[in-house]
Regions:
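N-terminal secretory signal peptides that target proteins for export/translocation
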Residues: 1-17
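Active-site micro-motifs of SAM-dependent methyltransferase domains
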Residues: 62, 85, 89, 169, ...
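General structural signal for alpha-helix termini and helix-helix connectors
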Residues: 62, 66-69, 92-93, 117, ...
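A beta-strand edge to alpha-helix "cap/lid" segment located at domain peripheries
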Residues: 45, 116-203
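A solvent-exposed, acidic/Ser-Thr-rich amphipathic alpha-helical stretch
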Residues: 75-144
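Short, hydrophobic alpha-helical membrane anchors of single-pass surface/secreted proteins
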Residues: 17-23
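Short, low-complexity N-terminal intrinsically disordered segments enriched in polar/charged residues
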Residues: 38-85
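Bacterial N-terminal signal peptides
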Residues: 23-37
Length: 203
C-alpha cells in the first residue's frame, strides 16, 4: 500500500510540470527550425545521401560513354546533372602529365578531342569500389575506374585508375564540385584478325 501511495504521489508531483516541459520542447523545436534544421534523423538521411552521391558515378560514366559514341552534346547534357556549374575536373596520366578544366562544357570538349584523336568508336566505363564519407552538405567520394576504349574489332585501349571527388549539396541535389582522376595504367590490347566467330546456339 505504501508503495502505491508513493507512486501516486510521484505522478501527482509530475503532472504540474507537464506544461513547462511542453513549452520547453516547443521552444527547442522552434529554435531548430529557425536555424534551418529538418526533422530527418541522421541515421535515416545518410543512406539516402550516399545513394544519391553514388549515382553521380553512374551519371558521369553515361555522359562519357555518350561522347564515346559520338554524341558530344548528349554527353555534356548528362554531365550537367553530375557536376556543379563551376566544377573543376582534372585527369592525371600515368606518365605524370595532366589536364584540368573548369565547367562541364570545357571538359566535354576535352573528352571528345581525346576520343576523336585516338580513333575510338565506342567506350565503356565501369565504376566500382565506391567509398563515401558524408559530413553535412559536403561529402568525399573515391571510386575505381576500369574503362575500355574501342579502336577496332581487334584493338582496345584499357584505362585503370581512381576518381577522387569533392561533392556538395546545392538546392537539394548532390553534385560533384571537384573531380580528380588518377590513372595508374593505360594499355593497348590487340589481337590479330581472326576467322573465329562467337557461336550462338539456335533455338
Amino acid at each position: 500500500m505504501e508503495k502505491r501511495k508513493n507512486q501516486r504521489l510521484a505522478i501527482s508531483n509530475f503532472i504540474p510540470r507537464l506544461p513547462g516541459i511542453t513549452a520547453l520542447i516547443a521552444a527547442v523545436v522552434a529554435l531548430f527550425v529557425l536555424l534551418g534544421g529538418t526533422f530527418e534523423s541522421a541515421l535515416a538521411s545518410q543512406p539516402n545521401a550516399e545513394s544519391e552521391i553514388e549515382q553521380l558515378t553512374v551519371c558521369y560514366a553515361l555522359g562519357t560513354d555518350a561522347i564515346g559514341k559520338g554524341d558530344v552534346q548528349a554527353g555534356k547534357n548528362i554531365y550537367r546533372d553530375c557536376f556543379t556549374e563551376d566544377a573543376t575536373i582534372t585527369a592525371i596520366f600515368p606518365d605524370g602529365g595532366q589536364a584540368t578544366y573548369t565547367g562541364t562544357n570545357a571538359w566535354g570538349d576535352f573528352v571528345a578531342s581525346v576520343f576523336r584523336g585516338n580513333g575510338y568508336v565506342a567506350t565503356q566505363h565501369l565504376i566500382g569500389t565506391i567509398n563515401i564519407a558524408v559530413q553535412g552538405n559536403n561529402a568525399k567520394m573515391t571510386s575505381y575506374l576500369h574503362a575500355t576504349h574501342k579502336r577496332s574489332e581487334t584493338s582496345i585501349d584499357v584505362a585503370n585508375g581512381t576518381y577522387e571527388d569533392e561533392v556538395v549539396k546545392q538546392n537539394g541535389r548532390w553534385k560533384i564540385r571537384r573531380r580528380t582522376l588518377k590513372l595508374i595504367t593505360f594499355l593497348n590490347l590487340s589481337s590479330p584478325p581472326s576467322t573465329v566467330r562467337l557461336s550462338i546456339p539456335s533455338r
